[in-house]
């Protein structure tokens, strides 16, 4: 691995990886819809994490698909994986923790298989891909759509959230990922919780904080995106900050807002532009929804605005990531701001 065989304690580690990747690293795409395409039944509160117990080979297949497509970073199937969630399905605490570790190990196994057997022509001159351990929000565990609103109720406190995330974070970090991706963060409070847990637990693995937005100005909760990004900027354990699971049409403006409060690399991996309806567990077309061609046509704009890591989230596919990788690697970026590359 580029990170020397395991996690390292070095400020700017992810920035260095981006530089080695040519100035812009490619993040993978959606997991759940790809698992369904391979035959997985995800009608469950655990969502894609269900496959950690029932079909880890399908998760490995999806990781391999993204590596073949040119991803520089693959994200573990732990977004919806929690100790409490697994226990509610009858697993013991020890079994639940082992399933969390498995999410990282399956991704690492896919990387090993790709290195030994895959078509590595797309990686010529690029560092080996990184494995990011995904940490989803408390709302993702609730599986009621509240990760898209940030509304956890007035009784939810910072200590409550710390107690929910602490052991899960410790287990995932102990599995040896290259970095930790705190994803689809809907509010400033949860970002503060993550930052404090990283410090309090002495976790030395580089991390990124990625928020979600419904309006291109604020996080899902209504907290201003610049205030949320400032939390990430103030945490020395956080190497990058950005947005995910957000409509592509909002990404450019969000990058510009985030740049005002941080010089850290910016990561963006939007969804397809469709809207998730929690009541029916469906994604529906909405204004601004884009196909792969239109989605990828925005990559240059995002890159010029300052994005240093670009990928896709819900409803994107290996085809999307392949097109992103092609756009990133073929385009000329003479006017890219130095902060995104150095």
From Swiss-Prot:
Question: Keywords, A to Z?
Answer: Amino-acid biosynthesis, Metal-binding, Methionine biosynthesis, Methyltransferase, S-adenosyl-L-methionine, Transferase, Zinc
Pfam families associated with the record: S-methyl_trans (PF02574)
Q: Which GO terms describe its biological process?
A: methionine biosynthetic process; methylation
Q: Which GO terms describe its molecular function?
A: metal ion binding; S-methylmethionine-homocysteine S-methyltransferase activity
What's the cofactor?
Answer: Zn(2+)
Report the EC code(s) recorded for this entry.
2.1.1.10
Q: Using the chain's own numbering, where are the disulfide bonds?
A: none
Residues of the Hcy-binding domain: 13-328
UniProt: Zn(2+) binding residues: 245, 313-314
The keyword Amino-acid biosynthesis appears for this protein: yes
Q: Could you tell me what reaction this enzyme catalyses?
A: S-methyl-L-methionine + L-homocysteine = 2 L-methionine + H(+)
Assembly notes: Monomer.
What is the annotated role of this protein in its UniProt record?
Catalyzes methyl transfer from S-methylmethionine (SMM) to adenosyl-L-homocysteine (AdoMet). SMM degradation (by HMT-1, HMT-2, HMT-3 and HMT-4) and biosynthesis (by MMT1) constitute the SMM cycle in plants, which is probably required to achieve short term control of AdoMet level.
Task: Kindly provide the name given to this protein in its UniProt entry.
Answer: Homocysteine S-methyltransferase 4
What does UniProt list as this organism's lineage? Answer: Eukaryota, Viridiplantae, Streptophyta, Embryophyta, Tracheophyta
